Regions:
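Mobile, glycine- and charge-enriched loop segments
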Residues: 1-5
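S-adenosylmethionine/decaboxylated-SAM
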Residues: 8, 13-167
């Protein structure tokens, strides 16, 4: 699927950048983090930040996958509303910015734009971000993606569908 292709392209970019701090915003299920856990062989330890999606099997699925790898994964789940999670992410990034960010979901166009703005604030220079194809395909989300491009487009190089590298 195009979503799987996007994840594969993002994994290649993460490997090239040898990323060690990854953030997923708008966590819907374990598919993105699972793809990271399966592919990640470029670092001894990787920090994964995500939003708690309330799914009890989420942790066990990731733990099972992680057992088959030599990488030490530190999964940090942020709990709360989109605003609370954004605030927590901004605080975490004050110490050290993120290398890679994946926006997996958003409840509205406004929420997506605000997630993009948080990404811009917490992503390091040369860092990569992606907006899930599943999000981009929703009619309502086009406006947010367009607004993001208008505001920050000059700061990013688009290197694939929904894949951006911060300059």
């Amino acid at each position: 699927s195009s979503y799987e292709q996007q994840l594969a392209s993002f994994a290649v970019a993460m490997r090239e950048g040898a990323v060690t701090r990854i953030l997923e915003l708008g966590t819907v299920d374990e598919s993105f983090l699972a793809s990271v856990v399966r592919e990640a062989d470029w670092a001894d330890s990787i920090e994964l930040h995500c939003a708690d999606n309330g799914d009890d099997s989420f942790d066990s699925k990731l733990t099972t996958l992680a057992e088959n790898t030599s990488v030490d994964f530190n999964v940090i789940k942020h709990i709360g509303s989109e605003t609370e999670i954004s605030d927590a992410i901004i605080q975490v990034a004050e110490a050290s910015r993120f290398d890679a960010i994946f926006i997996a979901g958003a409840t509205s166009s406004e929420a997506l734009l605000s997630a993009c703005m948080v990404c811009h604030e917490v992503l390091r220079s040369e860092g990569i971000m992606a907006i899930s194809i599943a999000v981009r395909e929703q009619d309502l989300m086009g406006a947010a993606v367009a607004s993001f491009r208008d505001m920050f487009g000059d700061s990013y190089e688009e290197f694939g569908e929904g894949l951006f590298r911060k300059q």
